[in-house]
């Protein structure tokens, strides 16, 4: 019986690992958001401010767990921003009803917690694809 339990835990852990956003997909999103994945600071995006490599909004930063010393500091620190994006994706991919792939991660990043279901985020996905990613990246 314990061998079955161990096998189940191993399979579950593999599922969790494979559902994580890949480095390749993160890079494509970063390139799209900050003109080649560069530190660009904060900019107005519609009616709200977006900051850093991934153009993270304050509400996104709160949802990712308030990493770093502040929203702007985390967004402008590549490693902190990556941790924030990974945490956000982990939090919402399972709740969104969408499968874990680069297309849906990009759409979540652009459109919020249910972004992968919004037709308006398909244009963003096409822009991310143009940065060199595919659905399976």
UniProtKB/Swiss-Prot annotation:
Residue intervals of the I-type lysozyme domain = 21-134
Q: Which Pfam families match?
A: Destabilase (PF05497)
Localization: Secreted
Query: Which residue positions does the secretion signal occupy?
Result: 1-20
Active site, renumbered: 33, 45
The organism's superkingdom is given as Eukaryota
> PROSITE patterns attached here?
LYSOZYME_I
Q: Which UniProt keywords apply?
A: Antibiotic, Antimicrobial, Bacteriolytic enzyme, Disulfide bond, Glycosidase, Hydrolase, Secreted, Signal
Task: Name the Gene Ontology molecular function terms of this record.
Answer: lysozyme activity
Give the reaction(s) catalysed: Hydrolysis of (1->4)-beta-linkages between N-acetylmuramic acid and N-acetyl-D-glucosamine residues in a peptidoglycan and between N-acetyl-D-glucosamine residues in chitodextrins
UniProt xrefs under Gene3D superfamilies: 1.10.530.10
Main localisation, per the record?
secreted
Enzyme Commission number(s)? 3.2.1.17
State the protein's purpose.
Answer: Has bacteriolytic activity. May play a role in digestion and in the host defense mechanisms against invading microbes.
Protein's UniProt name: Lysozyme
Q: Which organism is it from?
A: Ostrea edulis (Native oyster)
């Amino acid at each position: 019986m314990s061998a079955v339990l161990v096998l189940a835990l191993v399979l579950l852990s593999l599922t969790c690992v494979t559902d994580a956003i890949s480095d390749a997909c993160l890079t494509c999103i970063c390139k799209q958001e900050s003109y080649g994945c560069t530190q660009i600071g904060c900019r107005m995006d519609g009616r709200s401010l977006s900051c850093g490599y991934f153009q993270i909004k304050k509400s996104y930063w709160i949802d990712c767990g308030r990493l770093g010393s502040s929203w702007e500091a985390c967004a402008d620190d590549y490693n902190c921003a990556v941790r924030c994006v990974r945490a956000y994706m982990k939090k919402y991919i399972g709740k969104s009803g969408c499968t874990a792939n680069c297309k849906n991660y990009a759409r979540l990043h652009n459109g919020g917690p249910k972004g992968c279901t919004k037709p308006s985020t398909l244009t963003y996905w096409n822009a991310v694809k143009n940065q060199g990613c595919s659905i399976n990246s």
